[in-house]
Amino acid sequence: AGLQWLASWPWAVVFLPAAPLWAGVLALLGGGLLAMRLPWQLRLWSVPLLVPLLCWQAPRPAPGQFELLAPDIGQGNAVLVRTATHTLLYDAGPRFSRESDAGHRVLVPLLRALGERVDVLMLSHRDADHTGGAAAVLAQQPGAALTGSIEAEHALQGLRPATPCLAGQRWVWDGVAFEVLHPTGAEPDHPARPNTASCVLRVASAEGGPHAQAVALLVGDIEAAQEQALLARSAPVKADVLLVPHHGSKTSSSPAFLDAVQPRTALVQAGYRNRFGHPAPEVLQRYAQRQVPVVESARCGAAIWSSARPDVVECERDKGRRYWQHTVP
């Protein structure tokens, strides 16, 4: 009881962004200096050695630019969209078991390590591989607004009321334009296939400046019929990077849609050797025929893409490989 009482105090627990190695080394030196039996005038020199670790902030995109971070959350979707001062989380990954989900195991630790405050959590649709970690994220991010294609009686509505995502919704953060392209609102409240009501989000960097405009398209689990509907409405789907629809399922990535999007890079979030066979070989073949490189989370780990360098995808498995990790065949 005493420990619980102490833990309830404000600032009883403080989470700091993960600082780089050099800041940790300086902090160790500073801590050692502070602990030594030296005159206080000398021990004061430990303070500047501790400051980098205590005050570290993760680098953010420049105004007008944005970054996508697609963590390896297994069979599901979760993409962090970061601008200069704002953050949107698109989907929250799968639930692994009754006691474990992508929110607790991946997203909350990631958000803490980056020192992120999420402004908006957008859930593309109600399937558990997209909403499984949402409760944990909402608990850790009390200021995050919730939006998405989830029905009024969904359990998450009891945690935080959700605003429906609808085509035509637009906003601008730090010069970066966000636009919802789907659903239109004409879909039934309880579609037989929730995939069909997936929120499609277009994110575009600012025009002009030192970089050409770059566009990302996050499409959830839309299928060929919704892809065709977007084309029929002349929706602005052309993009530099595409989150592959429905994890690379046979039901999506129709040839006409890929021809319209013309992505430079395609990201697939799917579990290693998942039981659905995602991404399907014939779907990968469609991208290969169009010379579009496909980056799979099972092989890449966390993938990082920046509008300032739209031709480059950084793979955490390559950047931070540990000696005990094996190469995925």
Question: Model segments located where?
Answer:
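Pre-active-site segment of Zn-dependent metallo-hydrolases
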Residues: T87-R126, I222-V237, G320-P329
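Transmembrane helix-bundle segments that form internal channels/tunnels in multi-pass membrane proteins
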Residues: A1-L69, T265, R286-E296, A302-D318, ...
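Divalent metal-coordination and catalytic microenvironments
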Residues: D72, V81, D91, L111, ...
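Short internal beta-strands
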Residues: V120-M122, A144-E151, T265-A270
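Conserved beta-strand hairpin/beta-sheet module of binuclear metal-dependent hydrolase folds
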Residues: P63-P109, A113, P194-E223
